[in-house]
């Protein structure tokens, strides 16, 4: 239970700090934008990132995602970081397979899901660029949180979840009436709990 309570603690910490900064800025005559818009009520992982730590998400999008090509083009660095991450993780998992096979299964499964998200996409060329650039952005965003393997894996999990959601959304568009689908009600909390502990 404590592991899942940590997701609430992270939100309260970050949102609380942001609200204090907004309040102090107002006392000095400055208006700062809202930094959290009830992210845990999001319909999907993409919307979550539009509502969570908006200043960081905007910075990552403007200065990392667009810099490595965004949806338009692929760059060396856009392909390099995800390839390096998956390659290093696979090498590590193979190296420790005498102790346990679980990291190897997880790594191969994550790589398979990432490739599958590209292969089943309606526009493969665009999704290759987009998914690799998004994965690079999330890996570097994880590294920004801390130079620790757990933050890099956290970034990779979010990059993978975003790639899967983008491909999934091509086949099952979001309802325009604002209501959450049954699938969204199941998958959103699952992705959040898995990636935030």
Model feature map: region roles:
Residues 1-197:
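Membrane-embedded transmembrane alpha-helical bundles that form the catalytic cores
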């Amino acid at each position: 239970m404590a592991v899942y309570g940590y997701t609430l603690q992270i939100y309260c910490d970050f949102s609380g700090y942001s609200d204090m900064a907004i309040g102090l800025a107002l006392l000095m005559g400055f208006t700062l934008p809202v930094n959290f818009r009830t992210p845990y009520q999001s319909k999907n992982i993409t919307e979550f990132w539009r509502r969570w730590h908006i200043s960081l998400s905007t910075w990552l999008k403007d200065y990392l995602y667009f810099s490595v090509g965004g949806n338009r083009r692929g760059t060396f660095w856009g392909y390099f970081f995800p390839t390096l991450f998956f390659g290093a993780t696979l090498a590590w998992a193979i190296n420790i397979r005498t102790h346990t096979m679980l990291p190897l299964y997880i790594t191969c499964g994550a790589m398979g899901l990432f490739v599958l998200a590209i292969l089943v996409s309606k526009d493969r060329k665009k999704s290759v660029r987009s998914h690799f650039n998004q994965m690079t952005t999330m890996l570097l965003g994880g590294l920004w949180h801390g130079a620790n393997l757990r933050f890099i894996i956290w970034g990779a999990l979010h990059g993978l979840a975003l790639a899967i959601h983008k491909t999934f959304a091509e086949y099952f568009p979001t309802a325009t009436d604002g209501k959450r689908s049954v699938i969204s009600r199941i998958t959103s909390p699952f992705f959040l709990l898995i990636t935030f502990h």
